[in-house]
Amino acid sequence: MLNCYLAFPKYDPIIFSVGRFSAHWYGLMYLIGFYFIMWSSIKRYKLISLNKEKIENILYFSFLNALIGGRIGYVIFYKTKEIFFNPYFIFKVWEGGMSFHGGLLGSIISIYYFSKKYNCKFFKISDFLVPLIPFGLGFGRIGNFINGELWGRVNTSFCFTMLFPGSYDEDVKFLLNNPHLQDVFDKYHLLPRHISQLYEMFLEGILLFIILNIFEKKKKPTGYMSGLFLILYGSFRIIAEFFRQPDPQIGLMFNYISLGQILSIPMILYGLILIINSK
């Protein structure tokens, strides 16, 4: 047992409240991510044959559809039973729970619609946008951390793991099959876990942004950047999932692979197809 585990920082997840309305840090992170995407897109608008107003329209509706799709995807993929017993659960976005894969589908619908409306190829638009998506992903993962959700798997042999108050129930269940960790639990009343939200922030936010923007500097055929994004995100997500605690209602499939990893495999395969067929 180590004595260097990190404590989850104590703070109020609510920034301020006015009557029944409360502004949460979680939601603010998504807005900051969207702001950076919007700001960067306007600065880069000359890279695509669309004016600033059209780019703004695409981004506003893509962001809205990403939120809707992300929430619906989360409920469908991870909380199917919950919606039957508590239909209003889908609207409680401040409690966390967004699916990237659902959000991606929502954004694709918006981009497809505007590609037809503005007579601009779908992959021209998506290639223009994907180098900026890591802004949203990175800040979204910070939001997950602030919300104290999506924590990692138990690890007592690594100093920079963290004690998450929200993991208490899962820690108790984990002890049933791992009684040798009882002394750790007795001392901290929690089990140390990987800070998987910050791992994902680095992989899906910082590293993905750097790689995509390096490749974008060299002229690529249409569809190439979109394919590269799908391959890289899918690969980084698969890596991160090995450190992230599987959703308790789903667990690991075949005792090894998570749902997030399964959903990422088609992304990688389609990304390869896009790159091979890019023109």
UniProtKB/Swiss-Prot annotation:
How does this protein lie in the membrane? Multi-pass membrane protein
Q: Does the keyword Membrane apply?
A: yes
Q: What is its EC number?
A: 2.5.1.145
Q: What does the UniProt entry say about where the protein is found?
A: Cell membrane
Q: Does the keyword Membrane apply?
A: yes
Source domain of life? Bacteria
Ranges that cross the membrane: 22-42, 58-78, 89-109, 128-148, 195-215, 223-243, 256-276
Q: What class of enzyme is it?
A: transferase
Per the record, its GO cellular-component terms are: plasma membrane
Listed InterPro entries = Lgt
Any one GO molecular function term: phosphatidylglycerol-prolipoprotein diacylglyceryl transferase activity
**What pathway does the annotation place this protein in?**
Protein modification; lipoprotein biosynthesis (diacylglyceryl transfer)
Swiss-Prot/TrEMBL keywords: Cell membrane, Membrane, Transferase, Transmembrane, Transmembrane helix
**Binding positions for a 1,2-diacyl-sn-glycero-3-phospho-(1'-sn-glycerol)?**
R141
> What's one GO BP annotation on this UniProt entry?
lipoprotein biosynthetic process
Q: What does this protein do?
A: Catalyzes the transfer of the diacylglyceryl group from phosphatidylglycerol to the sulfhydryl group of the N-terminal cysteine of a prolipoprotein, the first step in the formation of mature lipoproteins.
The entry assigns this protein to a family as follows:
Belongs to the Lgt family.
**NCBIfam families assigned to the protein according to its UniProt record, in alphabetical order:** lgt
The protein here is known as: Phosphatidylglycerol--prolipoprotein diacylglyceryl transferase
Organism, scientific name: Wigglesworthia glossinidia brevipalpis
Its gene is lgt
